[in-house]
Amino acid sequence: MSPRPAFDPTLYLVTDTGLCGPRGVPAVVRAAVAGGVSAVQVRAKDGGDRERLALVRAVQDVLRGTGVALIVDDAVDIALIAGADGVHLGQSDLPAAEVRRLAPDLLLGLSVSTPAQAAAVDPAVVDYLGVGPVRATATKPDAAAPLGPEGLRAVVAAAPVPCVAIGGIHPDNLDALRGSGIAGFCVVSEVCAAADPEAAARALRTQWHGRAS
């Protein structure tokens, strides 16, 4: 078994094809990485598997040589075929332990929304957790009730692996996540829908690092 890829979750971008619009996902990713995005998850719910594979490969071309990890949402087969760095699973996706047996070298992320779900994670199987939603978010209307900063802290405290916050995170509420113990935070619309994704990413990263305590 080879070591799993390096992974910096500080500023974790989850792509949204619709929000990226005519610019396209790869162009937005390129700009966002220039602004300081440190990990990218390709989330594409529309289209067939071939289209999703083509998108993952296009983003992979953008990320090559940058050191930024490429994570694929849900689709273990596409992650393996493309040679991505990892896959991110939801609670209703394939069991994490089964995926780990199938893909021992992939980074494996899992979405959780309660302390009990976090505490049940096997750190030999799962590398990191996506915790949320922290706030209400329009990009995932079927998400659980918002945790808020206190709920986020409770989930992180129960987790045996690093946690990344997700859901409705914007510059005006980012500072409320300080002291929660998170290893990083995810954004979707804040970067994908921005007129200048590079500037949006840079502003988020500067705010997080510039006022970190």
Swiss-Prot record:
It catalyses: 2-[(2R,5Z)-2-carboxy-4-methylthiazol-5(2H)-ylidene]ethyl phosphate + 4-amino-2-methyl-5-(diphosphooxymethyl)pyrimidine + 2 H(+) = thiamine phosphate + CO2 + diphosphate; 2-(2-carboxy-4-methylthiazol-5-yl)ethyl phosphate + 4-amino-2-methyl-5-(diphosphooxymethyl)pyrimidine + 2 H(+) = thiamine phosphate + CO2 + diphosphate; 4-methyl-5-(2-phosphooxyethyl)-thiazole + 4-amino-2-methyl-5-(diphosphooxymethyl)pyrimidine + H(+) = thiamine phosphate + diphosphate. Binds 1 Mg(2+) ion per subunit. It comes from the Bacteria. Its EC number is 2.5.1.3. One of its GO terms (molecular function) is thiamine-phosphate diphosphorylase activity. Mg(2+) binds at residues 74, 93. Pathway: Cofactor biosynthesis; thiamine diphosphate biosynthesis; thiamine phosphate from 4-amino-2-methyl-5-diphosphomethylpyrimidine and 4-methyl-5-(2-phosphoethyl)-thiazole: step 1/1. Keywords: Magnesium, Metal-binding, Thiamine biosynthesis, Transferase. The keyword Iron does not apply. GO terms for cellular component: cytoplasm. 2-[(2R,5Z)-2-carboxy-4-methylthiazol-5(2H)-ylidene]ethyl phosphate binds at residues 137-139, 168, 188-189. One of its GO terms (biological process) is thiamine biosynthetic process. 4-amino-2-methyl-5-(diphosphooxymethyl)pyrimidine binds at residues 41-45, 73, 111, 140. CDD domains: TMP_TenI (cd00564). It holds the Pfam family TMP-TENI. Its cofactor is Mg(2+). Belongs to the thiamine-phosphate synthase family. Condenses 4-methyl-5-(beta-hydroxyethyl)thiazole monophosphate (THZ-P) and 2-methyl-4-amino-5-hydroxymethyl pyrimidine pyrophosphate (HMP-PP) to form thiamine monophosphate (TMP). This is Thiamine-phosphate synthase.
